Regions:
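N-terminal amphipathic alpha-helix/helix-capping segment at the start of soluble metabolic enzymes
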Residues: 26-57
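Hydrophobic faces of well-ordered beta-strands that scaffold small-molecule active sites
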Residues: 56-58, 86-88, 144-146, 166-168, ...
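Active-site mouth loops of central-metabolism enzymes
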Residues: 56-70, 119-123, 143-147
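Conserved, mostly hydrophobic/aromatic
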Residues: 59, 78, 157, 192
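Glycine-rich, proline-tolerant flexible connector loops at the mouths of alpha/beta enzymes
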Residues: 84-124
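Active-site beta->alpha loop and helix N-cap motifs at the rims of alpha/beta catalytic domains
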Residues: 111-170, 175
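Glycine-enriched alpha-helix->loop->beta-strand junction motifs that scaffold or abut catalytic
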Residues: 158-166, 184-189, 209
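Active-site-adjacent beta->alpha loops and helix N-cap segments on the catalytic face
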Residues: 168-186, 197-207
Length: 209
């Protein structure tokens, strides 16, 4: 890699005992579905819910550092670890950052460019690179998706890559315009709720339903 060398330990996953995912699913049912069965197909041929094993997703994020070979290595490691899906992140930097932040000098030892905008751009994969990475994941029989952090990225993931589901970051739980834009794509959504209170979670769920 360019500025730092990744040291990644592969841990083989073991399917958890049934009571773990059953109890978690029961909580979801009681809180948001009024006790109705919480079960749906997240990727083709794979349902999630009370009577199904945990669906384990490897978080690749932007750890590819803008390099396709490293992205493929992350996929290989996800497969070797026993994950069913690998998830990346997609951002349009000039859509989510102000000009002042984009132009800010960024000269730390791990910087990938002289400004923060150039640094962030260097950590992104292009559309064509994402297409290559998705095809590689498919060749390894592992599901592929990504978190879209802006509407342009969501459009690409839905219309360009046709991801099976969207993963929304907890940072965007209160980003109602982005949640609504994503929900209109008609695909399943997995929405993180870190640091949110239950009222905000309810509002987000109501919006996307």
């Amino acid at each position: 890699t360019r500025n730092c060398k990744a040291h990644i330990k592969i841990i083989k996953l073991i399917t958890p005992p049934p009571h773990i995912y059953s109890s978690m699913s029961s909580i979801a049912e009681n809180k948001f579905t009024g006790g109705a069965a919480f079960e749906f197909e997240l990727v083709p041929g794979r349902k999630v819910g009370p009577n199904h094993p945990c669906f384990v997703i490897a978080e690749a994020g932007n750890n590819h550092q803008g390099e396709v070979p490293l992205a493929k290595k992350l996929i290989d490691m996800a497969v070797e670890s026993g994950c069913e899906c690998v998830k990346f992140q997609k951002r349009t930097t000039n859509a989510i950052l102000t000009k002042a932040i984009l132009d800010r000098p960024y000269t730390g030892r791990n910087a990938f460019g002289p400004t923060y905008g150039e640094h962030r751009d260097a950590l992104e994969l292009s559309f064509s690179q994402f297409e290559e990475v998705k095809k590689y994941a498919e060749s390894k029989n592992i599901a592929f998706t990504a978190s879209g952090w802006d509407e342009a990225s969501i459009d690409f993931l839905a219309d360009g890559l046709d991801v099976p589901f969207f993963k929304m970051a907890s940072a965007d739980l209160s980003n109602f315009p982005l949640l609504e834009h994503t929900a209109k794509k008609g695909k399943p959504m997995v929405i993180s709720t870190g640091m949110a209170d239950i009222d905000l979670v309810r509002k987000a769920v109501t919006l996307v339903k």
